[in-house]
Amino acid sequence: MFRNQYDSDVTVWSPQGRLHQVEYAMEAVKLGTATVGLKNKDYAVLVALCKPTSELSDTQRKIIPIDDHLGISIAGLTADARVLSRYLRSECLNYKHSYDTTYPVSRLITNLGNKMQTTTQRYDRRPYGVGLLVAGYDERGPHIYQVTPSATFFNCKANSIGSRSQSARTYLEKNLNKFLDSSKDEIIRHGIRAILGTLPTDEQGKDAGQYDITVAIVGKDQPFTILSNKDSAKHVAIAKENDNDTPRNDDDDDRPSPPEEPAAGPRDPEVLVATEQRP
């Protein structure tokens, strides 16, 4: 994106009613590797593709446990995610200390959105350059939430964020009706198939053990758990065997946009796979 006279400060509106600094922060989410969140009637699953920033570095974790009933997966600036995860942990600990129960997921995400929103209307702050997928379980069942740098959050049935995540969303849209009645293992493998669709063609032929894919699950009688590398590789192998048509779309992915003049008119939110109305 080219700079213009309306993007010098996060509090400056353009004549089209846009906040360009907030939109630039949303572009940072597309720089991170893809991550997928989906759920059935009893479990919520996060699947993240981890890649090192260089050949000399190790991979950074993309799934962060918050509480026994909650965890997040990130795409974007890891440092910003670290600040937000610390805030979420503090909120969960304080709530459990005060009420001796776990923090309701919807209320926690609302408070997180309120915290992130303040950075979009103060001149001395900048928006958080990270997107979150939140998987949680409470008395209302499993939850998948998407939280954007604009402080907007959505209750989803399934979703994907990060680089090339459109391919994963295509898979999720096509198989959405299968998720609700799927088993615990099946919902994990659906997430893995979706994340494999974000890989370039030359990387899709690797053996199952060569993928650095992290899987986490939370649900009924299941605290938030990140699966071991051995268990993740086992699920990847089975998912690849049962899927001979991994979806991908190189022409419609979520890589960072090339430099261009922002189009006139308000910018609509990114289309989600599926959302749920909050009761």
Curated annotation (Swiss-Prot):
Modified residues (Phosphotyrosine): Y103
Family recorded in the similarity comment: Belongs to the peptidase T1A family.
Gene behind this protein: Prosalpha6
Subcellular localization(s) per the UniProt record: Cytoplasm; Nucleus
Bias-annotated ranges (Basic and acidic residues): 235-249
Record's protein name: Proteasome subunit alpha type-1
Assigned keywords, A-Z: Cytoplasm, Nucleus, Phosphoprotein, Proteasome
Function (record text): The proteasome is a multicatalytic proteinase complex which is characterized by its ability to cleave peptides with Arg, Phe, Tyr, Leu, and Glu adjacent to the leaving group at neutral or slightly basic pH. The proteasome has an ATP-dependent proteolytic activity.
PROSITE patterns: PROTEASOME_ALPHA_1, PROTEASOME_ALPHA_2
Keyword Phosphoprotein part of the UniProt annotation: yes
Record-level GO BP terms: determination of adult lifespan; proteasome-mediated ubiquitin-dependent protein catabolic process; ventral furrow formation
Pfam families (alphabetical): Proteasome, Proteasome_A_N
Statement: the UniProt record of this protein carries the keyword Ribonucleoprotein: no
Positions of region (Disordered): 235-279
GO cellular component: cytoplasm; cytosol; nucleoplasm; nucleus; proteasome complex; proteasome core complex, alpha-subunit complex
InterPro entries: Ntn_hydrolases_N, Proteasome_alpha, Proteasome_alpha-type, Proteasome_alpha1, Proteasome_asu_N, Proteasome_sua/b
Subunit field text: The 26S proteasome consists of a 20S proteasome core and two 19S regulatory subunits. The 20S proteasome core is composed of 28 subunits that are arranged in four stacked rings, resulting in a barrel-shaped structure. The two end rings are each formed by seven alpha subunits, and the two central rings are each formed by seven beta subunits. The catalytic chamber with the active sites is on the inside of the barrel. Interacts with PI31.
